Every structure is written in structure tokens, then in C-alpha cells.
């Protein structure tokens, strides 16, 4: 554990937080100044975190680094305890990149710009707080704070059903997060002594197996909602379908990853014994997510809802990796979170770019867009190839790593591994089907046989641009392809996707030392339980069905 000489992590959190409260007092009538201010703050914070991790972070150290701990409210055991390790560091960088580029993507926001950028910076700070908090109560507070800006960003700047989608998101996530608070209180109070929510100290406690199972189940619900695990996923398509593109970039690129992070940090890290019993369930849920998400995505005729269900499918690989009991599998789960964060962000951004021109997300109303927007077509195609795990893209590296982790696991029976990999492969086959069909519906064809729809008043039909079955009138008198700002955002994501695809160690070297340490603790717990609970583990390699059934005994 390395204590920081300077509060670097606090600075990374407080910079966007304090800057957000300056926005209301900045003199600006048209919102142009606050736009540049928010972008400058986001970029400065991202540069700061890059400097900290390049100069102050030791990649070879699996322990917590840059540790800061101050007794904040000692009466209830709350402390300002923040630090990073291999699990949190890459996700902090992901949050910084995605949020900064989403601010740039929101450049045309002209409705209540002060409030919009205030909420974006507040969300920026809360995201970082979730990933660096090492006090469970502080983690819960950051988790809750993050809900407020997301709710407002969706409900104010969303589509026609924005209030319904925002309320559904809030109810799902707020209700589920209660389990985090309950689990924290139970662990803090167990064993007597001074109350503490410090995760390191909570990890040293020896909880009864029955208590661990209950706490694990509660945390699984809380993180399962955020990770969009079936059947807790239904808020996600609605939220993405109604949220603006910059908000969808953060929802898919960062917020989903909080669920996976929580499973690794708390469920595996603090409750390794319970993880032994729940791991097969996670593997089964992962397969269900992969297949269900793929089928559901193919059935969507709204572009953003199709991408949302594809996220449900891709998060199934995170569950498989976490459940694998192998170093390679957990590494693949981390790589999948990072890869999907980049891929989902660029796809939702390009969906927003397309909507800005066509004013529709209905796939059956599009067609032939490639002729009018060749640059967007090229960028969208590259993003789709990454999502369907084309070799040379980060999606391929992450998913093949998860498969290797599952197949090489010595915990599950051969039958279980073969069936799991086979069913997950079905999802891989379905992925190009729903993505390539979306590309065909949106970009291919000539768009010649269309009915003109005057969606803007006082405009001539001669200014219409035709797509598929309808023609629309863009905001500008002349139709335009992707602009330099939009190209820069998309290329920034795609460059990283390709770089990680060709050289995965760009990402894996950040966290592999830590994921090996986490898996080592789980493997040790597995060995101890297998030696003492012969009624559950018939042999060194346990029977999975008995393992799952034991949970309900």
C-alpha cells in the first residue's frame, strides 16, 4: 500500500466537482463560454489522470496505490478513503476519456446549456469517485450521487418518452443500490469493535458462509442492475432509446462498467467464499445475456435500442470471465469492459450523428445514407466491425480471452465448459447478423422511392434528403457529412480500439497483476472449501449441479 505525498486522486475528483459549481456564475448568454469551460475542465482532468498514472503509478504493484485516508465522519465510521489499483486505474482512464469526448459531442446543446454542462461535470466527478473509493459507505454515496445527473440529463434532454425512461432508470438503480448500503452496514457491524467501512479492513473479517451468501446475493442484484444482467436489464433500452447521444455514450461506455467493477471489487474481493457458490450462476446468466441480448437486438427497429440490447449481450462476456476461476478469464472480463466502453461510446455517438441529419432512429425509415454521408458510413462500419469482434479490433481480443479462460478452467466439468462455450458462440454468430443488417438498413440502397415528410415548417421539398421509405428536411439548407469535430471524436475511439486489438497489452499490463491476485484469493477459498465440504464438492473438480443446489440447502 503506497500512500500519496500529494492528494492526486482527490484533485482528480474535486476538479470537475468544484468547476461545476462555477458554471452558474460564469457570464454567458448563449452558452458558448460554459461549453468551452466544461470541455477545458474535462480535458484538464483527463490530462491530470494520465500524468498521475504514468508518473506515480507502479504497474508491477498489485496493492492499493496513491492512498488517501481522512476520517470524515468518524461517528459513523465514514472516511474519505480513496486509492487505485489495477482494477480501478483503467476504468478511471476510461471514464475520463469517454466523458471528455461526450462533452465535445454535446457541442450543439443550446437548451439550458448551463445546467447541462453542470450536470456533466458533476457526473464526471461521481464516476471517478465510484472507481477510487475504498470506503464502502463513500462508495455508496458516490454511487447515489451519480444517479442524480443521469436522471436529469435523460429527463430534460431526452426524447418524447424521456421522463418515463429517466424515472425507470432511477427506480431500478436506486432501489437496487439499497443492497449496497445494507451489505456495507452488515459487514461493518459484524464482529463488534469500532465501526468501519474501510474495504481493506472488511476484507480481513471472517464472515459465516450463510452471511456471505446473503450479502453476495444482494450485491449481485445491485451490480446486476447496473451491468444490465437479465432480467434486471429492462431500464437500459428505454434509457438509451430516449437519452441524447452524449448521455448514451456515458451510459454505455462507463456506467455499465460500474456493475462489473463492483462484482470484482466487492463480490470477489470481499466475499470469495460466496463467489465459489455463485460463480456457476454467473456463468449461466452470462450465456443467457449473450444469447438473449443478441436475439432481442435483432428484433429492434430503433437504432439506439438495437445498440442497447447489443450491450446487454456483450456484458454477458464480462460475467463469463468473472465466473471462470482463471487468471485469463478475469483478465478477459476487464478487457471486455474497456473494449465495450470504447466501442459502445463510438457507436452511440455515430447514431447521434446520423439522427442529427435524418431526425429519425427508425431503421425502416432509412436507407441510402452512405451516398450522402460516406464519412459517417466508413466510421460507423468500423465501429460495427469492432462490435462484432473482427480480428484486429479490441472486441476480438477481449472475447477470445474470455473463451480461453472458460475453456481452461479446472473447476467446472468438461460438459459444463463445452456447453457454455457452445452457447456463447451462438451469440457470436448472431452478433454480425443484427449489426450487418443494421448497416444494410441504414446505409445501403439508393433511397429513391420515398414519401416526402415535411418535418420542418416553411421549407421547400427540394431541400429534402431521402432515406429509405421517407424523406426528411435537415436543419441546414445543404446536407453535410461528418464534420471535423465529429470525425475527431470517432477516430479517437477507433484508434484506441484498433491499438488494443493489435496489442492488447496496452490495456492488460495495467490490471493483470491485480486480477491475478484477486483470482488467487478466490482459488484459495475454493481449495479450502473443497477440502472441508465433501458433501458439496465430490472431488477436487466439483460437480457444478451440486454446487449450485447447495446454495438452496
Swiss-Prot record:
Reactions mediated catalytically: a plastoquinone + NADH + (n+1) H(+)(in) = a plastoquinol + NAD(+) + n H(+)(out); a plastoquinone + NADPH + (n+1) H(+)(in) = a plastoquinol + NADP(+) + n H(+)(out)
Biological process per Gene Ontology, one example term: ATP synthesis coupled electron transport
Membrane topology, from the record: Multi-pass membrane protein
GO molecular function, one term: ubiquinone binding
GO cellular component, one term: plasma membrane-derived thylakoid membrane
Disulfide bonds: none
Record has Iron-sulfur as a keyword: no
TM region positions: 6-26, 34-54, 87-107, 115-135, 136-156, 169-189, 210-230, 244-264, 276-296, 312-332, 333-353, 376-396, 418-438, 487-507
InterPro entries to which the protein is assigned, alphabetical: NADH_Q_OxRdtase_chain4, NADH_Q_OxRdtase_chainM/4, NADH_UbQ_OxRdtase, ND/Mrp_TM
Enzyme class, spelled out: translocase
UniProt-annotated location(s): Cellular thylakoid membrane
Key words of the record: Membrane, NAD, NADP, Plastoquinone, Quinone, Thylakoid, Translocase, Transmembrane, Transmembrane helix
EC number(s) recorded for this UniProt protein: 7.1.1.-
Family matches, as PANTHER family: NAD(P)H-QUINONE OXIDOREDUCTASE CHAIN 4, CHLOROPLASTIC, NADH-UBIQUINONE OXIDOREDUCTASE CHAIN 4
HAMAP family for this protein: NDH1_NuoM (MF_00491)
Family: Belongs to the complex I subunit 4 family.
Protein function: NDH-1 shuttles electrons from NAD(P)H, via FMN and iron-sulfur (Fe-S) centers, to quinones in the respiratory chain. The immediate electron acceptor for the enzyme in this species is believed to be plastoquinone. Couples the redox reaction to proton translocation (for every two electrons transferred, four hydrogen ions are translocated across the cytoplasmic membrane), and thus conserves the redox energy in a proton gradient.
Protein name, per record: NAD(P)H-quinone oxidoreductase chain 4 2
Source organism of this protein record: Microcystis aeruginosa (strain NIES-843 / IAM M-2473)
Protein encoded by which gene: ndhD2
Amino acid at each position: 500500500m503506497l500512500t500519496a505525498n500529494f492528494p492526486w486522486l482527490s484533485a482528480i475528483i474535486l476538479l470537475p466537482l468544484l468547476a461545476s459549481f462555477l458554471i452558474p456564475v460564469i457570464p454567458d448568454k448563449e452558452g458558448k463560454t460554459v461549453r468551452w469551460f466544461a470541455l477545458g475542465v474535462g480535458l484538464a482532468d483527463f490530462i491530470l489522470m494520465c500524468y498521475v498514472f504514468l508518473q506515480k503509478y507502479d504497474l508491477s504493484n498489485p496493492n492499493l496505490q496513491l492512498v488517501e485516508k481522512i476520517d470524515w465522519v468518524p461517528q459513523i465510521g465514514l472516511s474519505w478513503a480513496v486509492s487505485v489499483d489495477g482494477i480501478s486505474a483503467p476504468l478511471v482512464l476510461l471514464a475520463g476519456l469517454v466523458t471528455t469526448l461526450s462533452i465535445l459531442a454535446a457541442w450543439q446543446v443550446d437548451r439550458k446549456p448551463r445546467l447541462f454542462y453542470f450536470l456533466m461535470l458533476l457526473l464526471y466527478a461521481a464516476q471517478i469517485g465510484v472507481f477510487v473509493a475504498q470506503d464502502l459507505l463513500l462508495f455508496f454515496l458516490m454511487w447515489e450521487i451519480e444517479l442524480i445527473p443521469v436522471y436529469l440529463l435523460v429527463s430534460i434532454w431526452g426524447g418524447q418518452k424521456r421522463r418515463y425512461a429517466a424515472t425507470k432508470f432511477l427506480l431500478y438503480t436506486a432501489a437496487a443500490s439499497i443492497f449496497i448500503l445494507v451489505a456495507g452496514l452488515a459487514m461493518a457491524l459484524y464482529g463488534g469493535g469500532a465501526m468501519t467501512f474501510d474495504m481493506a479492513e472488511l476484507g480481513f473479517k471472517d464472515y459465516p458462509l450463510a452471511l456471505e451468501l446473503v450479502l453476495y446475493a444482494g450485491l449481485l442484484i445491485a451490480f446486476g442492475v447496473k451491468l444490465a444482467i437479465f432480467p434486471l436489464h429492462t431500464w437500459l433500452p428505454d434509457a438509451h432509446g430516449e437519452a441524447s447521444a452524449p448521455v448514451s455514450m456515458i451510459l454505455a461506455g462507463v456506467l455499465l462498467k460500474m456493475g462489473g467493477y463492483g462484482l470484482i471489487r466487492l463480490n470477489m474481493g470481499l466475499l470469495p467464499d460466496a463467489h465459489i457458490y455463485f460463480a456457476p450462476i454467473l456463468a449461466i446468466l452470462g450465456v443467457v445475456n449473450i444469447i438473449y441480448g443478441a436475439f432481442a437486438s435483432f428484433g429492434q427497429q430503433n437504432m439506439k435500442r438495437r445498440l442497447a440490447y447489443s450491450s446487454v449481450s456483450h456484458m454477458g462476456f464480462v460475467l463469463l470471465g468473472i465466473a471462470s476461476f482463471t487468471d485469463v478469464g478475469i483478465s478477459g472480463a476487464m478487457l471486455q469492459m474497456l473494449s465495450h466502453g470504447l466501442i459502445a461510446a463510438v457507436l452511440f455517438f455515430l447514431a447521434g450523428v446520423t439522427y442529427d441529419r435524418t431526425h429519425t432512429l427508425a431503421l425502416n425509415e432509412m436507407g441510402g445514407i452512405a451516398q450522402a454521408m460516406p464519412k459517417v458510413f466508413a466510421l460507423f462500419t468500423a465501429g460495427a466491425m469492432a462490435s462484432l469482434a473482427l480480428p484486429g479490433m479490441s472486441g476480438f481480443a477481449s472475447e477470445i480471452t474470455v473463451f480461453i479462460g472458460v475453456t481452461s478452467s479446472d473447476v467446472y466439468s468438461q460438459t459444463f465448459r463445452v456447453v457454455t462455450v457452445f452457447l456463447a458462440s451462438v451469440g457470436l454468430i448472431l452478433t454480425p447478423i443484427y449489426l450487418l443488417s443494421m448497416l444494410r438498413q441504414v446505409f445501403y440502397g439508393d433511397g429513391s422511392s420515398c414519401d416526402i415528410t415535411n418535418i420542418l415548417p416553411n421549407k421547400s421539398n427540394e431541400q429534402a434528403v431521402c432515406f429509405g421509405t421517407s424523406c426528411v428536411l435537415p436543419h441546414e439548407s445543404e446536407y453535410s457529412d461528418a464534420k471535423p469535430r465529429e470525425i475527431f471524436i470517432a477516430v479517437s475511439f477507433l484508434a484506441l480500439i484498433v491499438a488494443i486489438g493489435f496489442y492488447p497489452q496496452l490495456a492488460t499490463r495495467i490490471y493483470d497483476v491485480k486480477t491475478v491476485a484477486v483470482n488467487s484469493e478466490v482459488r484459495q477459498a475454493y481449495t479450502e472449501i473443497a477440502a472441508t465440504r465433501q458433501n458439496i464438492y465430490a472431488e477436487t473438480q466439483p460437480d457444478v449441479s451440486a454446487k449450485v443446489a447447495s446454495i438452496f440447502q
